[in-house]
Each structure stands twice: as C-alpha cells, then as structure tokens.
Amino acid sequence: MKKLLLSFFLCLLGLATFAQPFEGGFFGGLSASQVDGDTYSGFNKVGLTAGGYISSDLARPWKWKAELRYIQKGAFQRTSIDNPDYYRLAIHYVEIPLLIQYFINDQLYLEAGLAPDVYLFHKEEDEYDDIPGDEGPAYHRFGLNAGAGIGYFITDRIIVGLRNSYSAIPMREHASGQTYLLNRGQYNNVLALSLYYHFE
C-alpha cells in the first residue's frame, strides 16, 4: 500500500511536470478531531499531521493542488470531578487530498476538494485499560473525506493553512450496527492547522 501511494504521488508529479510549471513543498502541523456518532463531543483529540504537496496553475485565479498527508484523528475525553469516564481513540491515516484553490489575492486563497484515505492502525483505551483492536466495529480500510480551508502566504516561502475535513462515508459502523437516513455510522471531523514551506 505504501508503494501504491508513493507511485500515485509520483504520477501526479510527472503529470504536473509535463502539463504546467509546478510548485511544491512540505508541511507539518497539528490536528484537532472528534468522532461524530460516538458518545463524546468536542475537538479534544490533538494529533500530528505532515506531508508534501505539488500544485500548478489552472486559469488564474484558480490552481489545483495534490497532497500526500499523514494525519492522526480520533476522539478524547478527560476525566473530571463530574465525569470519571476516560476515553482516548487515536487513528492513523494516510490521505491524498485533491484540491481546487481560488486566490483572492497574491497572499490569500480558499480551497476545497476530496481526500481519499487509507487506514493504517489505531489505539483505543478507556479508564480501565486498552481496548482490543478486534473489539467493536472494524475500521474501513479505505475512506473518503470532503474538505475546505483557507491559506495565507506569510512570506513567499511560508504559508499558514487551516482546513476542516469530514468523512464523506463512515469510517466505521455504529457499535449497534444500526443506521438512520444519512447517519450510517461514525464519521471523522477534523480541523488541521499546518505550516507550509513552499518552493517553485
């Protein structure tokens, strides 16, 4: 699977090379996430995200962008006086966000697109102990996310970006297996703040 992802990204790089002058870079940052459909709420699970990207012009002010991104998602609840329950879920993914960007000016842009992902592994624990990986609904090996964000060029090389992404399909079923209308299971809801190093 790692070879497949690398091959896909290299193909995008090759297409960009022959189609238009391309730009690229790498990035790192933090993610804050929750799982919609569980019994916990709030963007309390903090994780890491990092990767690389390429981009190229379409018709100004539009550009396309493709990333290869490692990202941690999940859910977290800290114990308190009122609630002794503790819960932590950390899910590790590789994503390939495919984005369209609209530049408002030379420094500020909006972006939106889809991001196929591959589930790598997870760790789940409560106030008692680690929860075995085979306990509860299985995680879907492949997923799809929809995302939108905003970015700002601090300098010609440094960009700060904020993006929200949401599972377009459930990342796993409800523990009960029940579904209702559009609620088909549990969904990742993630905010990612990243610092990009950009080169041309």
Regions found by a protein language model. Give the residues of each.
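Outer-membrane beta-barrel translocator domains and adjoining extracellular loop/strand segments
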Residues: 36-41, 76-83, 122-130, 172-178
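Outer-membrane beta-barrel "beta-signal"
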Residues: 23, 27, 150-159, 185-200
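Repeated loop/turn-to-beta-strand initiation elements of outer-membrane beta-barrel proteins
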Residues: 22, 61-64, 108-110, 156-160
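Residues that define the transmembrane beta-barrel architecture of outer-membrane proteins
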Residues: 20, 42-48, 90-94, 140-144, ...
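Residue-level signature of outer-membrane beta-barrel architecture
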Residues: 54-56, 102, 118, 152, ...
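Outer-membrane beta-barrel channels and translocator barrels
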Residues: 19, 59-61, 105, 155, ...
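Transmembrane beta-strands of outer-membrane beta-barrel pores
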Residues: 30-34, 70-74, 116-120, 164-168, ...
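Membrane-embedded beta-strand positions of outer-membrane beta-barrel proteins
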Residues: 26-28, 66-68, 98, 112, ...
